[in-house]
Amino acid sequence: MRQLLANARRHEAQMVRLLGRFVRAESPSTDKAAVDRFGRLVAAEWRGHGARVRILRQRAYGDHVRAELFLGRGRPRGQILVLGHLDTVYDVGTLARTPFRIARGRAWGPGTFDMKSGLVIALFAVDALRRAGLRPSRRLVFLWTS
């Protein structure tokens, strides 16, 4: 556990940069186009980390993103499903009034806590498993909905 925590600390600046990119990509629940744009950004990040990604098209609300990885050997023995969401409750334009920033050791901005930091943590958690040489025997599936 200490190794994983130390690893996370070494990558903190990268995590904060990605969180800033995610927060600046406004994605209000009621704006399908904005959620879809953010979903494409999230999908690209997961692809860049070796995941097989599918965009699950939705008619009325933002598309869902499914990212899948298997770090183990042989065949997966089941899967672990991690759920989250891409949309936020903040209207487009909120960012102009409440920009992303780091103050007093904390990140601030629309969607920072719910749920964009969780999306960043999930991505870096997979990288941490790899760097630690941990190979879960189950497929890792991440489903980000809107």
Where are these regions (language model features)?
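Acidic/His- and Gly-rich active-site-bordering loop/insert found
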Residues: M1-P110, A128-S137
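Acidic/histidine-rich catalytic neighborhood of metal-dependent amide-processing enzymes
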Residues: M115-S146
